[in-house]
Swiss-Prot record:
It is an enzyme of class 1 (oxidoreductase). This is Glutamyl-tRNA reductase. It comes from the Bacteria. NADP(+) binds at G189, A190, G191, R192, M193, A194. Homodimer. Catalyzes the NADPH-dependent reduction of glutamyl-tRNA(Glu) to glutamate 1-semialdehyde (GSA). SUPFAM superfamilies: Glutamyl tRNA-reductase catalytic, N-terminal domain (SSF69742), Glutamyl tRNA-reductase dimerization domain (SSF69075), NAD(P)-binding Rossmann-fold domains (SSF51735). GO terms for molecular function: glutamyl-tRNA reductase activity; NADP binding. PANTHER family: GLUTAMYL-TRNA REDUCTASE 1, CHLOROPLASTIC. The active site is at C50 (nucleophile). Its EC number is 1.2.1.70. It comes from Synechococcus sp. (strain JA-2-3B'a(2-13)). The gene is hemA. Pfam families: GlutR_dimer, GlutR_N, Shikimate_DH. The lineage of its organism: Bacteria, Bacillati, Cyanobacteriota, Cyanophyceae, Synechococcales.
Length: 431
């Protein structure tokens, strides 16, 4: 079996492409099940965030599995593969393993060291498990990646004071406007990103903040988390609130734009200054809004200027994090390499155990019933101990071989010397 990841991220694709390939949380399970109907796709998991869509697969045929995954993504979203392929990346074997662990550790994020990605990796594992998309290998891989992410956050300082998408968005608005204490700010959405937006806005001096959300109850719950007064409005008041604001942030899970040129043209004054910062993928603000005079629109791809300033300061901290990730990669790879040896080791142990039982039965029959009953446990433990000690070193050495060809050569020798057929043995065990 082989591990691969096919995907795109803020490094390979602009937001216009990322939003087209975005997969909503409610659609992940069904999407994985569809992918697993393809030949050669044994396991699958999907990590979908505002800055990346990554499909992790375990495949019996590497080339076919990767090709099928690429074609599946193109057909899923109705994007011709030749148009999509330049934005996709593919990583195989250990490179795929290392990539997921770096992602979970925040080392591949737009904002270096940001913490939200770890919870998103955990969610990807939960969704993959819920639809039976993940089995032994991907479960182990995601568990190892989550461990790597946790270690990086607890054993290094890369997460201390790290920016988030939300804090970078507020910083960008502050640089554009000079001050956040004047005028009204509207935050559209009431999820985690919206909560962080409000938190950072208050920290940067904003005093007149309104939260608008489809669920008024969720918006009220968000507002109650802060001591400062936060106004809450129902969804029907969205356009009025935007028209009264000089700064608007959007952070919702909507799959279509919630603000467009026609809507805003109907409520804004001619040349009314308005700064819109959209941190959602798919985008909440239609690109045609930029045609309005006086209106500035920023999306997640515009945060790079802010992020790079923060990244340069944090690059030294990343070195220690990379070392921890490498340790977790080595541990996973050692386990993964050992999987190939399991059928050979199991068939060898089964054969030797059968011989032990047969020979012990012969010996006990010659020793007589009374002796056998009296000393059965001792003789059984003795022979079992001898067998285990004889097999111990060969098994350890076989599992420990890092070179693939050397390990396979050793397995072939064992199979030939002991007349083993691991494939037949495994089939018998599965009956």
């Amino acid at each position: 079996m082989f591990i691969a990841v096919v995907g795109l991220s803020h490094r390979t694709a602009p937001v216009e492409i990322r939003e087209r390939l975005s997969i909503a949380e409610a659609e992940v399970g069904e999407t994985i099940q569809q992918l697993r109907t393809h030949p050669h796709i044994e396991e699958a998991a999907i990590l979908s965030t505002c800055n990346r869509l990554e499909v992790y697969i375990v495949t019996s045929e590497m080339e076919s599995g990767v090709r099928q995954t690429m074609q599946f993504l193109a057909e899923l979203k109705g994007i011709p593969l030749p148009q999509l392929r330049p934005h996709l990346f593919t990583l195989l074997y250990q490179d795929a393993v290392t990539h997921l662990m770096r992602v979970a550790a925040g080392l591949d994020s737009l904002v270096l060291g940001e913490g939200q990605i770890l919870s998103q990796v955990k969610k990807a594992q939960q969704l993959g498990q819920a639809c039976n998309g993940m089995d032994r290998i991907l479960n182990r891989l995601f568990k190892a990646a989550i461990t790597a992410g946790k270690r990086v956050r607890t054993e290094t300082e890369i997460g201390t004071g790290a920016m988030s998408i939300s804090s970078a968005a507020v910083e960008l608005a502050l640089q554009e406007q000079g001050s956040l204490s004047q005028g009204k700010v509207t935050v559209v959405g009431a999820g985690r990103m919206a909560r962080l937006l409000v938190q950072h806005l208050l920290a940067k001096g904003a005093v007149d903040i309104t939260v608008v959300n489809r669920s008024l109850e969720r918006a009220e719950a968000l507002a109650k988390q802060f001591e400062q007064p936060i106004q809450v409005l129902p969804w029907e008041s969205l356009l009025n609130s935007v028209a009264e604001s000089n700064l608007v942030f959007t952070s919702t899970g909507a799959t279509q734009p919630i603000l467009n040129y026609q809507q805003l043209a109907g409520v804004l004054q001619p040349d009314q200054p308005l700064l819109l910062v959209d941190i959602s993928v798919p985008r909440n603000i239609d690109p045609d809004v930029e045609k309005l005079k006086g209106v500035q629109v920023f999306n997640v791809d515009h945060l790079s200027r802010i992020v790079e300033e923060n990244r340069a300061q944090r690059q030294k901290l990343a070195l220690a994090a990379e070392a921890l990730v490498e340790e977790e990669v080595d541990q996973f790879m050692e386990w993964w390499r050992s999987l190939e040896t399991v059928p050979t080791i199991s068939s060898l142990r089964h054969k030797v155990e059968s011989i032990r039982e047969q020979e012990m039965e012969k010996a006990l029959s010659r020793l007589g019933k009374d002796f056998a009953e009296k000393h059965l446990e001792v003789i059984d433990a003795l022979t079992r101990g001898i067998v285990n000690k004889i097999l111990h070193d060969p098994m350890v050495q076989l599992r420990a071989k890092r070179d693939i060809e050397a390990r396979r050569a050793a397995m072939r020798i064992l199979q030939e010397l002991f007349n083993l057929d691991p494939v037949v043995f495994q089939a018998q065990q599965e009956r």
